Amino acid sequence: MAPVPEPINEMMAYYSDENELLFEADGPKQMKSCIQHLDLGSVEVGNIQLQISHQLYNKSFRQVVSVIVAMEKLRNSAYAHVFHDDDLRNVLSFIFEEEPVIFETSSDEFLCDAAVQSVNCKLQDREQNSLVLASPCVLKALHLLSQEMSREVVFCMSFVQAEERDNKIPVALGIRDKNQYLSCVKKGDTPTLQLEEVDPKVYPKRNMEKRFVFYKTEIKDTVEFESVLYPNWYISTSHPEEKPVFLGHFRGGQDITDFRMETLSP
């Protein structure tokens, strides 16, 4: 009959000095001593739990020693230890791996879900000319009599998304109760102002196209509207009455770029 290998000798064949590095904090000498006196089964010594499993392999017994570092190390310490944030951080650092989180710019489909804030207002230039619709797509500056004030256009000014600038608020100017917005387009080489028809199911929205967006700047008791698409071009009126509102490149002189704004209650 073939001799059965001694359990201790078979166990030590699977033991390596490298294991001492893993349990150096608990004392490698104590670890070796515990292994030399193990019986078959499961043993718990101090802070370390040892389990021995049996497996039949090639018609001979082999013992596999698995060393499990138990969480009892914290609870069975010889001294009272309060579990601090650093302890939890150390535990989690072994479980989770830190990775950078990259934030991408939100697309318009998400921005459109955000409510667009707006106010109703009327605009008069510094010469007290009111803005009126002379035709469905033509906006003019006229001096109105008191009985004609009902002709004055009411704007729905929406606060929209754009690159931030000091003391400049990005807005879009739509005509209330109409699907029309002031927009800036180029005709030839010159930026021009027009009234553009839009889809009421889509507009207004937070991320308006640049042609619809103006920087509103407050100067004392007046405001200016500068095109975002064409910097230094402003919504303007001219001194002669009944001229269309246009996009002007000059401030002062014949071009009037400053307006008094009257905010209306909802």
Curated annotation (Swiss-Prot):
SUPFAM superfamilies given in the database record = Cytokine
Q: Which residues form the propeptide?
A: 1-113
Tell me the keywords, alphabetical order. Answer: Cytokine, Cytoplasm, Inflammatory response, Lysosome, Mitogen, Pyrogen, Secreted
Q: Where in the cell is it found?
A: Cytoplasm, Cytosol; Secreted; Lysosome; Secreted, Extracellular exosome
The disulfide bonds in this chain are: none
Query: Which is one GO molecular function term here?
Result: interleukin-1 receptor binding
Per its UniProt entry, which superkingdom is the organism in?
Answer: Eukaryota
Give any Gene Ontology cellular component: cytosol
Give the chief site where it resides. cytoplasm
* Signal sequence interval, chain numbering: none
What are the recorded Gene Ontology BP terms?
cellular response to lipopolysaccharide; cytokine-mediated signaling pathway; fever generation; immune response; positive regulation of cell division; positive regulation of immature T cell proliferation in thymus; positive regulation of T-helper 1 cell cytokine production; positive regulation of type II interferon production
- Function per UniProt: Potent pro-inflammatory cytokine. Initially discovered as the major endogenous pyrogen, induces prostaglandin synthesis, neutrophil influx and activation, T-cell activation and cytokine production, B-cell activation and antibody production, and fibroblast proliferation and collagen production. Promotes Th17 differentiation of T-cells. Synergizes with IL12/interleukin-12 to induce IFNG synthesis from T-helper 1 (Th1) cells. Plays a role in angiogenesis by inducing VEGF production synergistically with TNF and IL6.
Give the family from UniProt. Answer: Belongs to the IL-1 family.
Q: What else is known?
A: IL1B production occurs in 2 steps, each being controlled by different stimuli. First, inflammatory signals, such as LPS, stimulate the synthesis and promote the accumulation of cytosolic stores of pro-IL1B (priming). Then additional signals are required for inflammasome assembly, leading to CASP1 activation, pro-IL1B processing and eventually secretion of the active cytokine. IL1B processing and secretion are temporarily associated.
What protein is this chain from? Interleukin-1 beta
Q: Which organism is it from?
A: Cervus elaphus
